[in-house]
Amino acid sequence: MEDERSFSDICGGRLALQRRYYSPSCREFCLSCPRLSLRSLTAVTCTVWLAAYGLFTLCENSMILSAAIFITLLGLLGYLHFVKIDQETLLIIDSLGIQMTSSYASGKESTTFIEMGKVKDIVINEAIYMQKVIYYLCILLKDPVEPHGISQVVPVFQSAKPRLDCLIEVYRSCQEILAHQKATSTSP
């Protein structure tokens, strides 16, 4: 079963949450951000090139124009490959673990897997960000030395920064799977 809902990020931008239910013990959540706007790309490129042309008219050095074009292209490629994330995915399977995938605008993907045996809980935490209180979903990892301790806090959906209403949807589904996993692991 699959459904899609629209939410907002902390800045008011649009986000699309796709929920895929494969089984009672396996669910996937995909948060998609809007693609790179052609208008903003054109505005930045024109600004850099006009500034370079202004410097060219003052200095009469053609290397300034060539450098501006080269730097703009390198900057755009770097932004698309290392910064702009189009989609973040959280896949949770109660018998295996949690997989988080970030898909960049260039097509590059970054995946992290956490074994379910290392997961203590999934919670919604709050933080102060840019003079605002924001909420974020995070995975608490068990401390291998102390059974009741937490060794690490792993934030989820770091790039999309969804608002609380979206996080609650994901949180409830994750808690259902964690409860199912605990029930099956304690039953004889």
Curated annotation (Swiss-Prot):
Q: In which pathway does it act?
A: Glycolipid biosynthesis; glycosylphosphatidylinositol-anchor biosynthesis
Note the Pfam families from the entry.
Answer: PIG-H (PF10181)
Q: Which InterPro entries match?
A: GPI-GlcNAc_Trfase_PIG-H_dom, PIG-H
Q: Where in the cell is it found?
A: Cytoplasm
GO CC, alphabetical: endoplasmic reticulum; endoplasmic reticulum membrane; glycosylphosphatidylinositol-N-acetylglucosaminyltransferase (GPI-GnT) complex
Q: Which GO terms describe its molecular function?
A: catalytic activity
The organism sits in which domain of life?
Answer: Eukaryota
Q: Which UniProt keywords apply?
A: Autism spectrum disorder, Cytoplasm, Disease variant, Epilepsy
Any one Gene Ontology BP term? protein modification process
Disease field reads: Glycosylphosphatidylinositol biosynthesis defect 17: An autosomal recessive disorder characterized by variable neurologic deficits that become apparent in infancy or early childhood. Clinical features include learning disabilities, mild-to-moderate developmental delay, seizures of variable severity, aggressive or over-friendly behavior, and autistic features.
* UniProt cross-references to PANTHER family, sorted A to Z: PHOSPHATIDYLINOSITOL N-ACETYLGLUCOSAMINYLTRANSFERASE SUBUNIT H
The record's family statement is:
Belongs to the PIGH family.
Task performed by this protein:
Part of the glycosylphosphatidylinositol-N-acetylglucosaminyltransferase (GPI-GnT) complex that catalyzes the transfer of N-acetylglucosamine from UDP-N-acetylglucosamine to phosphatidylinositol and participates in the first step of GPI biosynthesis.
Could you describe the subunit structure of this protein?
Component of the glycosylphosphatidylinositol-N-acetylglucosaminyltransferase (GPI-GnT) complex composed at least by PIGA, PIGC, PIGH, PIGP, PIGQ, PIGY and DPM2. Interacts with PIGQ.
What is this protein's record name? Phosphatidylinositol N-acetylglucosaminyltransferase subunit H
Give the gene symbol. Answer: PIGH
